[in-house]
From Swiss-Prot:
CDD domains from the UniProt entry: AOX
Catalytic activity entry: 2 a ubiquinol + O2 = 2 a ubiquinone + 2 H2O
Transit peptide residues according to the UniProt entry: 1-56
GO biological process: carotenoid biosynthetic process; plastid organization
Function of the protein: Acts early in chloroplast biogenesis as a component of a redox chain responsible for phytoene desaturation. Prevents the generation of toxic oxygen radicals and photooxidation of the nascent photosynthetic apparatus. Involved in the differentiation of multiple plastid types, including chloroplasts, amyloplasts, and etioplasts. Might participate in the chloroplast respiratory chain.
Name of protein: Ubiquinol oxidase 4, chloroplastic/chromoplastic
Gene assigned in the entry: AOX4
Region of interest (Disordered), residue spans: 71-91
Positions bound to Fe cation 2: 175, 227, 296, 299
Effect of residue 299 to A/E/N: Abolishes cyanide-resistant oxygen consumption
Length: 351
């Protein structure tokens, strides 16, 4: 998605000088032709003027069509992750306050994540698979916490965004299979590890529900921090034990999930990719951890996109034809989405 956004913004940045250049050329040709009129007969002057106006009109029409096409391309490919435009003077104080709030939220999230990481580093310094088991137990929690809150919002008519529910379920489904892989590798063999993971997950669930009700942006950023740590953890493990992993067989659950499982759901959580473009090949345990690591990177991208309200789209729904959506008869009201409980209550009262 970031790549698409870069292409879109780059296209628009280059296109405007092109339009200006075309118009300047048209102006030069128009003024030079008028200077030639004084040296031509009357009939030639009329012919030249007629042709000149025709050419100028064609150039301006091409420029207008070019601008229309480029603006529509920008609207269709916008992901919500592009930098915001510079605020005007009247809203500068509001923007500064919001920026301060965002920095505060992210600072708290980073502090909490680092604190949990230090605990895991202390308890699981030499027990890799047990650490992965605890990490995957925790990592899948926020997605069904998000769905719980969204289902509650749907009950009150505050939310009608099916894409979020589809993507979050696909994310929880992916993390569940990561957990099954770690269990097959023996990561849950100790009672203490299961006890710790389950109780952390219980606390994490209610904390995420509270954060998501208070500020979805903060909850999504916290989940992004967790997924980012998971990516770094697996990446370090691959670099340290890659050769050893290449000589070990892949768990059956991993082969089934990545090559013969529900590939629709596998595509659904990767919102930065087109469906059917990632099909892993699993030959050994190294391939399994490479794909788990890459899954965590996709989760990071999705969580980052979610931090902009209304920007998340299901990969498969993007491919749907607009005519098909209109014929389905399911019309989503523009106000049927909100950002936190305060925004939901305000919209329910004013609507």
């Amino acid at each position: 998605m970031a790549a698409i956004s870069g292409i879109s913004s780059g296209t628009l940045t280059i296109s405007r000088p092109l339009v200006t250049l075309r118009r300047s050329r048209a102006a030069v040709s128009y003024s030079s032709s008028h200077r030639l009129l004084h040296h031509l007969p009357l009939s030639s002057r009329r012919l030249l003027l007629r042709n000149n106006h025709r050419v100028q009109a064609t150039i301006l029409q091409d420029d207008e069509e070019k601008v229309v096409v480029e603006e529509s391309f920008k609207a269709e490919t916008s992901t919500g992750t592009e930098p915001l435009e510079e605020p005007n003077m009247s809203s500068s104080s509001t923007s500064a306050f919001e920026t301060w709030i965002i920095k505060l939220e992210q600072g708290v999230n980073v502090f909490l994540t680092d604190s949990v990481i230090k605990i895991l580093d202390t308890l699981y310094r030499d027990r890799t698979y047990a650490r992965f088991f605890v990490l995957e137990t925790i990592a899948r929690v926020p997605y069904f916490a998000f769905m719980s809150v969204l289902h509650m919002y749907e009950t009150f008519g505050w939310w009608r965004r099916a894409d979020y529910l589809k993507v979050h379920f696909a994310e929880s489904w992916n993390e569940m299979h990561h957990l099954l892989i770690m269990e097959e590798l023996g990561g849950n063999s100790w009672w203490f590890d299961r006890f710790l993971a389950q109780h952390i997950a219980t606390f994490y669930y209610f904390m995420t529900v509270f954060l998501y009700i208070l500020s979805p942006r903060m909850a999504y950023h916290f989940s992004e921090c967790v997924e980012s740590h998971a990516y770094e953890t697996y990446d370090k493990f691959l670099k340290a034990s890659g050769e050893e992993l290449k000589n070990m067989p892949a768990p059956d659950i991993a082969v089934k999930y990545y090559t013969g499982g529900d590939l629709y759901l596998f595509d659904e959580f990767q919102t930065s990719r087109t469906p059917n473009t990632r099909r892993p090949v699993i030959e050994n345990l190294y391939d399994v951890f490479v794909n788990i690591r890459d899954d965590e990177a996709e989760h990071c991208k999705t969580m980052r996109a979610c931090q902009t309200l209304g920007s998340l789209r299901s990969p498969h729904s993007i491919l749907e034809d607009d005519d098909t959506e209109e014929e389905s008869g399911c019309v989503v009201p523009e106000e049927a989405h909100c950002e936190g409980i305060v925004d939901c209550l305000k919209k329910s009262i004013t609507s």
